[in-house]
Amino acid sequence: HEPDISFVEAATEEIIPFLKKGNLYIIESTSPIGTTEKMQKLIYASRPELEGHIHIAYCPERVLPGNIMLELVENDRVIGGVDEAATQKAISFYSKYVKGEVHGTNARTAEMCKLVENSSRDVQIAFANELSLICDKADINVWELINLANKHPRVNILQPGCGVGGHCIAVDPYFIVSDYPMESKIIGTAREVNNYKSFWCAEKIQNEKLKFELAHGRKPSIALMGLAFKPNIDDLRESPAKYIVNRVLQNDSNSEYFIVEPNIDSHNVFKLTNYNVAIVDADIVVYLVAHEEFKNHKIINDKVILDFCGINK
């Protein structure tokens, strides 16, 4: 989980020969604190004549997969230069097309801002996921509990799931934990909770499978609903659902599994099944991702349902 800025370094080295006085150099990639300053040193080491004559800044992207082009224009942006002149130069550039508000700061604060945004989400999701673990032991419906708790005007608990995925929220907290391990206890623990939730879901599926075998004298057929890292997208990066499916299928070639992901046509590892086939033929139906396609189908009553994402809440 150590940060790797080699791609930022490689990209910077590629453009160094082409930089000219007056140019504006901007990093948008999520990066550890101090990366912009490191790239400044890298540039000046190769091109000392540019020192004080180019503008270097950091402006993290804030976009939602599936809605990128709109959010590039509409969302507020945080922009931090290595000095005030660089900040103002970058603000002038982004103001040409960004309709959201543009907020100026310094490079280190802008870098940390991006990490904090995603780490904050991770911590909040970890609280919801931890509640789901507690409620499972306490025989409480976690979805009802959260709905009732959120009736309080100053409470806003997020929804639990089968973990946290994607190439942002599941990754960015490590940039803070790696550099400040003693000071980031909550952030680090949140990562552990969210990773554990995926393992816990896989164990719940295995336990339900064994219960079915004991009750019926045969192995169940199991539908695993969803592979994407969040609802209604086709992105599988760092997906907890994909981890769970891999773990459940591991060393179990005798059982019949129906893997459903409506947002992709095929997968290089998993054989995909149509939802309508899976929901009819499976004995156990496991909801891993809250895709709209799953919400729009009626649940068949004679199935064993494991709902980790609130499809039936």
Regions found by a protein language model. Name each.
Residues 1-313:
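Structural/interface elements that position substrates and couple domains in central-metabolism enzymes
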